[in-house]
Design a protein with these regions (language model features):
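H-loop/switch region of ABC-family ATPase nucleotide-binding domains
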Residues: 165-166
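Conserved ABC ATPase "signature" region
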Residues: 84-101
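Conserved ABC transporter NBD signature motif
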Residues: 33-41, 51
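Helix-to-loop junction immediately C-terminal to a conserved catalytic motif
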Residues: 25
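ABC ATPase nucleotide-binding domains
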Residues: 202-239
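Conserved ABC ATPase signature
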Residues: 105-109, 113
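Conserved beta-strand-loop-alpha-helix hinge in the C-terminal portion
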Residues: 185-209
Length: 239
């Protein structure tokens, strides 16, 4: 996985996607092959080297990550533990959309709100590799765009994001590279646009609908743009 990239992993339930994340995080040991982080076998890392500065994992249900009585206390504890100034903590709360529920108990949050709060806490650890298991679960379309902006910002600052997701549209629009996991192995991998444009099953609805008319159109915005452009060309030819 290239450093600084947003790497998405898709595949059917039970294919091994979440297991892969647990192996990268060092939570489980592979029975074949090996996991290397920056060229070094994960087993050679001391726990203090691995967590949280090298790897951080956001699970599907992050409720077990919370120990404080409010989101604010949770973020303040994370900021203090990792030497993050108060103003940076407030900025992280703002960009992750947590400010509206800072005083609430994490257990009282919706699934999407919990995801945001957990992501805010993990961002402050400044990991080199951020692992996300179904990060868009419970999120509305508007916040998915905000999440993508956050992840892209992390990548531009040198972090590597590896996300497992069933959200094909999200992966197609925002990931740099995408891999398909089947029966515990990577069956395909490539640049996101090429991956989804050349796939029959794991592709976007926009690509399925438009592939007879537009080659390599993957997202809704691309299809709309190409339709408008085609209409303009047709109208121009009639004139």
């Amino acid at each position: 996985v290239p450093k600084g990239s947003f790497f998405a992993v898709v595949g059917a339930n039970g294919a091994g996607k979440s297991t892969m994340l647990s192996l990268i995080a060092g939570l489980n040991t592979p029975y074949r092959g090996s996991v290397r982080l920056f060229g070094k076998k994960i087993g050679k890392y001391k726990e203090s080297e691995l967590y949280p500065k090298t790897v951080a994992l956001l699970p599907q249900n992050p409720i077990s990550l919370f120990t404080a009585n409010s989101v604010r206390e949770e973020l303040e504890a994370a900021a203090k533990a990792h030497g993050v100034p108060a103003e940076d903590m407030e900025k992280t709360a703002r960009i992750t959309g947590c400010r509206e529920f800072l005083e609430r108990h994490p257990y009282d949050l919706s699934g999407g709100e919990r995801q945001r709060a957990a992501l805010a806490a993990l961002i402050m650890t400044k990991p080199k590799i951020l692992l996300l298991d179904e990060p868009t679960k419970g999120l509305d379309a508007a916040y998915k765009k905000e999440l993508a902006d956050i992840l892209k910002s992390l990548c531009s600052n040198g972090a590597t994001v590896i996300a497992v997701s069933h959200d094909i549209e999200f992966c197609a629009e925002y990931a740099d590279i995408c891999a398909l996991v089947f029966a515990g192995s990577a069956a395909a991998c490539g640049e996101a646009r090429e991956f989804f444009a050349g796939n029959s099953f794991y592709t976007t609805a926009a690509n399925r609908i438009s592939r007879r008319f537009f080659k390599n159109a993957v997202t809704n915005d691309e299809v709309v743009y190409l339709c408008r452009k085609q209409k303009e060309n047709t109208d121009g030819a009639r004139q």
